[in-house]
């Protein structure tokens, strides 16, 4: 869908970089990031001594882990002036606590950047979405990776975005029309703090979560699905690892050559049969029919698109059309497992 603004325009308009993480317990933060990277197949030793590019690091909190792995070169491509200041302050403070490689901040947009030398590892987390421009940028991003290098990006399903889509729609009844960003954030923090505090391991600051998830127009670009990613970057890449781990490949390893490899096809088949599990991490259900899952995902996309269109048009009334779209998704979820009938029914 077409949004009035993207992430960057919104950030620049308000001079914000609302992606800060709580790193007061730095050891815990680094362990969390290390667990993620190890799970996707990139342990610390695979980063050490490598040339790394990270696109859209925001305030830089997540970059601390990569820096602590001592890459040979660490470039941060970030066009947001507010983020530059926060990155510099973050590294100034934390380099006193642990050994860090000082990153090079490249103060450009991805659209204006060209890499004269390719990187071993390219990272772009939770930024590029599904609109035409951002899918083209994904293609550009992939060209910065050396042959047999690693590209780390955020992929996902609209099903995984559903809880935040519902929270976003509910926020329409909380904030007043034409309120300032500051007033809207204060109202949302007041409304959602008790709820957010039930998420034990949430690390994003509540203020930034409200600015980014409940108010930022870039929310509606979502993340590309794995199928979109493969379509955009072609067969130059295969999905090497993911978190959560999606596929279990029981084929005989000696058969994995030439046209038999089909790593992406095996991953996509497993992914489509498991996307219902993105809705609620409290339940891990058995794989189910791919077509039923894709129908559920389409309903989730429909709801997200409707909410985004309403906001673009200035119509944030939770009326029959919105409720009907929500119920269409809920009905499909309740069919999957009766556990969801109580909170969703």
What does each of the following model-derived ranges do?
Residues 112-122:
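A short acidic, Gly/Pro-enriched loop at the edge of an enzyme's catalytic core
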Residues 135-147:
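A short glycine-rich, Lys/Arg-flanked "PGG" loop and its adjoining helix->strand segment in the class I
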Residues 204-345:
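Rossmann-like AdoMet/SAM-dependent catalytic core
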Residues 150-188:
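Conserved class I S-adenosyl-L-methionine
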Residues 26-49:
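Conserved alpha-helix/loop element of class I SAM-dependent methyltransferases that forms part
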Residues 120-133:
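A short SAM/SAH-binding and catalytic strip from SAM-dependent methyltransferases
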Residues 59-71:
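Conserved SAM-binding loop of SAM-dependent methyltransferases across substrates and taxa
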Residues 80:
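Conserved SAM/SAH-binding beta-strand->alpha-helix loop
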């Amino acid at each position: 869908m077409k949004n009035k603004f993207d992430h960057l325009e919104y950030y620049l308009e308000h001079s914000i970089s609302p992606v800060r993480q709580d790193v007061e317990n730095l050891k815990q933060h680094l362990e969390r990031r290390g667990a993620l990277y190890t799970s996707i197949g990139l342990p610390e030793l695979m980063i050490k001594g490598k040339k790394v590019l990270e696109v859209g690091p925001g305030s830089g909190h997540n970059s601390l882990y990569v820096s602590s792995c001592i890459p040979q070169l660490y470039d941060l491509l970030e066009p947001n002036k507010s983020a530059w200041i926060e990155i510099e302050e973050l590294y100034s403070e934390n380099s006193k606590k642990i050994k860090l490689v000082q990153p090079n901040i490249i103060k450009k947009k991805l659209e204006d950047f060209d890499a004269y030398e390719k990187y071993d590892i390219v990272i772009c987390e939770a930024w590029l979405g599904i609109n035409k421009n951002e899918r083209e940028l994904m293609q550009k991003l992939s060209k910065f990776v050396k042959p047999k290098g690693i590209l780390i990006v955020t992929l996902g399903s609209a099903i995984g975005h559903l809880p935040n889509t519902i929270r976003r729609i509910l926020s329409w009844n909380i904030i007043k029309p034409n309120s300032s960003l500051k007033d809207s954030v204060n109202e949302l923090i007041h409304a959602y703090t008790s709820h957010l505090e039930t998420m034990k391991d949430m690390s994003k600051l509540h203020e930034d979560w409200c600015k980014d998830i409940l108010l930022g127009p870039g929310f509606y670009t979502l993340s590309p699905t794995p199928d979109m990613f493969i379509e955009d970057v072609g067969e130059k890449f295969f999905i090497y690892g993911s978190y959560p781990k999606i596929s279990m490949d029981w084929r005989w390893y000696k058969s994995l050559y030439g046209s038999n490899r089909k790593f992406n096809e095996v991953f996509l088949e497993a992914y489509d049969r498991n996307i219902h599990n993105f809705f609620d991490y409290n339940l891990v259900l058995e794989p189910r029919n791919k077509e039923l899952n894709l129908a559920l995902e389409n309903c989730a996309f429909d709801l997200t698109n409707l909410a985004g269109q309403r906001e673009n048009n200035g119509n944030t009334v939770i009326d029959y059309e919105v409720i009907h779209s929500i119920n269409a998704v809920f009905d499909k979820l309740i069919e999957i497992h009766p556990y969801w009938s109580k909170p969703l029914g």
